[in-house]
Amino acid sequence: MSKPKKIILCPNPYRDKDMTVAARSKEILDQEGFETVVCLPFQKEGYGAELGVPIQQLDREIKRADLLIAFGGDGTILHLAKTLAMNRVPVLGINLGSLGFMSELEPDELERLRDLKNWDLSIENRMMLDVSVVRDGRTVYNTIALNDAVISKGSIARVVRLEIYTEEGFLTWVGGDGVVISTPTGSTGYSMATGGPIVEPTARNILISPICPHSTRSSSYVLDPSHVIHVKAPDANRKFVYLSSDGGKAF
C-alpha cells in the first residue's frame, strides 16, 4: 500500500479539551510529510479557535482520506464507526477515555506515529451488524453497528417478552429486560455484562445474550454471521421496547 495522502485527526472535544494530544500528533505527522486535517466527531462551538486550528467538515474530508486517527475512548470510535465503514477508511485510536479496548496507542506513545511513514500497517477487518426496524412490512429505521444492537424495555419497570427467529424459523424467546445482539468486537461490552461469551474480535459471529432473563434456562447463542436475526415484540409489548445501536440514541 502506498503512502497516504491524507490523515484526518478527530479529537473528542470533551476528552482532548485543549487539543493538546491532537496538536502534538499533527505536528509529528506534518514533519513526516503527511497531509493532515482536523475534524470533530461532534461539534463543540469555539473548539480549536484559541489555537488557530481550522476545523473541517468530516463528511467532506473523509471522502479522500486514507486514515482517521480518533482521540478519545471506545465511545468516540463507536460514534465514528458508521461514517468510517461507509467510506472504507481505517481508524487508529489514541486512548483518552476510561475504556480503550479499541485503541492502539496511549498519549505517551505519540512518537510511534512516525512509524506510519513506512505505511507498513496491519489492518484488522471487523464485522458489523446491519440493523433495521420493520413495521407492517416497511423499513422505518436502518443503521449499522460495530459493537451491538440492544433491544430493551428502557426505564419501564416491567418484563418484556421478545421472540427471536432466524431465517430458518423460531430460535428462542426472552422474557426479561431485553436482549443484546452483538458482534465479536462488542463481546467485551454490554454483551459481556449480561454473561455473554467473549469472542476474539476478528472472528465472524453473531452473539445473542438475554438481559436479566426471567427464566434460569435462558442462555446465550453464538451464530454464524450468514443468519438474519428477527426479533419480534408481541403487540402488548411494542410500546415498551426500545432499540439502541452502539450506545446511541434509542429508537
Set out the residue ranges of the language-model regions.
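ATP/NTP phosphate-donor binding region
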Residues: M1-L67, D108-E124, V133-T143
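Short glycine-rich anion-binding loops that position phosphate/pyrophosphate groups of nucleotides
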Residues: Y14, D74-T76, L99, T185-S187
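Short glycine/serine/threonine-rich phosphate/pyrophosphate-binding segments
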Residues: D18-M19, G75-L80, T188-A193
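Gly/Ser-rich helix-loop-strand patches that form or flank binding pockets
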Residues: H79, L84-I94, F101
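Catalytic core of DAGKc-family lipid kinases
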Residues: S98-D177
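Structural signature of FAD isoalloxazine-binding scaffolds in flavoprotein oxidoreductases
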Residues: K117, E200-T202, I208-P213, V222-P234
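ATP/nucleoside-binding phosphotransfer catalytic cores, i.e., glycine-rich phosphate-binding loops
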Residues: I151, I156, E167-F170, T216-F251
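Gly/Ser/Thr-rich active-site loops/lids in small-molecule metabolic enzymes
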Residues: T172-R217
